[in-house]
């Protein structure tokens, strides 16, 4: 199986807000970034899978791709933190998360380990084909762990 992974371009959201499952559209100027992505894709693909969140489907639609939506490649669920300013979440909560990046479960959400389990389930269901994924930073970090064998802690800190 050949896997090509693309992260959505910058979403339309106020700087400094926590977002994962928030269903955000892309910034108005996303077309320029999308054109660069389009030019760099090693086409064709047998299948394209896309997160069902708008910021991914909007990019796939702009690129003119036929795709399947799959909820297993949605971004991590930050639960009660979604849409809050990082400075409103509180230092103690953020420190607890940073102390245990793999297992810390966001209140009302999921942990990075949960995300990895979800992405692993997705990976094992894929056919042996040339596949494009349009997804999120958290999913790409999980793939870094699952496909490349990087420790889960290192994958959680991987910059996308």
Located regions from the model:
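Phosphate-handling substructures
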Residues: 63-118
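Short beta-strand scaffold positions
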Residues: 50-51, 117, 134-135
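Extreme N-terminal starter segment of soluble prokaryotic enzymes
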Residues: 1-4
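A glycine-rich beta-strand to alpha-helix segment
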Residues: 129-140
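Domain-level recognition of soluble alpha/beta enzyme cores
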Residues: 150-160
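Active-site-proximal alpha-helix that buttresses catalytic centers in soluble enzyme cores
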Residues: 6-65, 110
């Amino acid at each position: 199986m050949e896997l090509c992974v693309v992260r959505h371009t910058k979403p339309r959201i106020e700087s400094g807000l926590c977002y994962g499952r928030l269903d955000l559209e892309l910034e108005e100027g996303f077309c320029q970034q999308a054109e660069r992505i389009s030019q760099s894709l090693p086409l064709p693909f047998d299948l394209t899978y896309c997160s069902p969140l708008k910021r991914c489907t909007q990019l796939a639609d702009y690129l003119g791709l036929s795709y399947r939506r799959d909820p297993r490649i949605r971004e991590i669920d930050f639960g009660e933190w979604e849409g809050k300013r990082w400075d409103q979440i509180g230092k103690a909560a953020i420190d607890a998360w940073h102390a245990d990046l793999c297992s810390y479960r966001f209140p009302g959400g999921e942990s990075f380990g949960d995300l990895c389990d979800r992405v692993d389930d997705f990976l094992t269901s894929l056919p042996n084909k040339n596949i494009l994924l349009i997804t999120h930073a958290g999913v790409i970090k999980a793939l870094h762990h699952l496909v490349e064998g990087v420790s889960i802690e290192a994958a959680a800190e991987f910059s996308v």
